[in-house]
Amino acid sequence: MDSNTVSSFQVDCFLWHVRKRFADQELGDAPFLDRLRRDQKSLRGRGSTLGLDIETATRAGKQIVERILEEESDEALKMTIASVPASRYLTDMTLEEMSRDWFMLMPKQKVAGSLCIRMDQAIMDKNIILKANFSVIFDRLETLILLRAFTEEGAIVGEISPLPSLPGHTDEDVKNAIGVLIGGLEWNDNTVRVSETLQRFAWKSCNEDGRPPLPPKQKRKMARTIESEV
């Protein structure tokens, strides 16, 4: 196993522990707590994949971080912070909408890269909106935290979420996954639109009908994908 993979996991475990202690003191805001829960699932998945114990990794990560801090000067820290572009966290959904449990009468699941797409194929003839919480850097979607599909009545009928065991995805991965979800929901004559915020940062455009500018070829491909899996 690559030593950098192990040490990266160890440092991530320790930094998660520090953030958890911060949250336990009721100092974290909603985006902070949301990322904390997501990262916990990711660490569990990575630990299982690597065959590493999280508690042991956390202790090792603490030693690595302490060694780095001992060597770090205040001036070097200021320069590092100044050189790193800041990302923004954008929210279409409330914390309640993100954490709410939901159930599917006819569940369908598809994995696309490091993203998991889930939808309820029992939903028909509904108006549906896709909402997402995600981070943005350089005015482009950076990381998807969670996307969910809601009916006008507020019911959750679909979802796109990162796989904890496969971290890392691009904005193109997210757009392709959204296309698959739209194709699956429209197969049952639902009308789907995407939130303005998600359109603006994923596609750099905003249509009044809420439809992202998917090329006709991509639409046909997605329709065939859903049809073959039903």
Swiss-Prot record:
Keywords: Eukaryotic host gene expression shutoff by virus, Host cytoplasm, Host gene expression shutoff by virus, Host mRNA suppression by virus, Host nucleus, Host-virus interaction, Inhibition of host innate immune response by virus, Inhibition of host interferon signaling pathway by virus, Inhibition of host PKR by virus, Inhibition of host pre-mRNA processing by virus, Inhibition of host RIG-I by virus, Inhibition of host RLR pathway by virus, Interferon antiviral system evasion, RNA-binding, Ubl conjugation, Viral immunoevasion
Chain span(s) of sequence motif Nuclear export signal: 137-146
Motif (Nuclear localization signal): 34-38
Region (RNA-binding and homodimerization): 1-73
Post-translation changes: Upon interferon induction, ISGylated via host HERC5; this results in the impairment of NS1 interaction with RNA targets due to its inability to form homodimers and to interact with host EIF2AK2/PKR.
Single GO term (MF): protein serine/threonine kinase inhibitor activity
Residue segments, region CPSF4-binding: 180-215
Residues spanning the signal sequence: none
Single GO cellular component term: host cell cytoplasm
HAMAP family according to UniProt: INFV_NS1
Family designation: Belongs to the influenza A viruses NS1 family.
Protein name: Non-structural protein 1
Origin organism lineage: Viruses, Riboviria, Orthornavirae, Negarnaviricota, Polyploviricotina
